[in-house]
Amino acid sequence: MVLLAENKDEMIANFKLHDSDTGSPEVQVALLTHRISYLTEHVKVHKKDHHSRRGLLILVGRRRSLLDYLRKKDIERYRSLIERLGLRR
């Protein structure tokens, strides 16, 4: 399912650090994870859609960069986020 405004607001509410938080690494990673899971299912069905596959790889790289940044800055926040999102690592 595509990320609708209601879903996006709900995800931001679940991962925000303070009231006006929309850009913290936790929020960004959560939104990217949702988009990645959607694109993963799309690519499984449409195997020849290389354009979407490339977009998926770009998103995975962006999420990896944010997670690496968070791990360097605050390991406890990183571990908490990984556990909440159910990511491997």
Curated annotation (Swiss-Prot):
Q: Which UniProt keywords apply?
A: Ribonucleoprotein, Ribosomal protein, RNA-binding, rRNA-binding
Q: Which CDD domains match?
A: Ribosomal_S15p_S13e
Give this protein's Gene Ontology molecular function annotations.
Answer: rRNA binding; structural constituent of ribosome
GO cellular component annotations of the record: cytosolic small ribosomal subunit
- Give the source's domain of life in one word: Bacteria
Q: Mind telling me which SMART domains this protein's record contains?
A: Ribosomal_S15
Residue spans making up a coiled coil are: none
Question: HAMAP family in the record, alphabetically?
Answer: Ribosomal_uS15_B
Query: Assembly and interactions?
Result: Part of the 30S ribosomal subunit. Forms a bridge to the 50S subunit in the 70S ribosome, contacting the 23S rRNA.
Which family, according to UniProt?
A: Belongs to the universal ribosomal protein uS15 family.
What is this protein's function?
Answer: One of the primary rRNA binding proteins, it binds directly to 16S rRNA where it helps nucleate assembly of the platform of the 30S subunit by binding and bridging several RNA helices of the 16S rRNA. Forms an intersubunit bridge (bridge B4) with the 23S rRNA of the 50S subunit in the ribosome.
Q: What is this protein called?
A: Small ribosomal subunit protein uS15
Provenance organism: Desulforapulum autotrophicum (strain ATCC 43914 / DSM 3382 / VKM B-1955 / HRM2) (Desulfobacterium autotrophicum)
Gene coding for it? rpsO
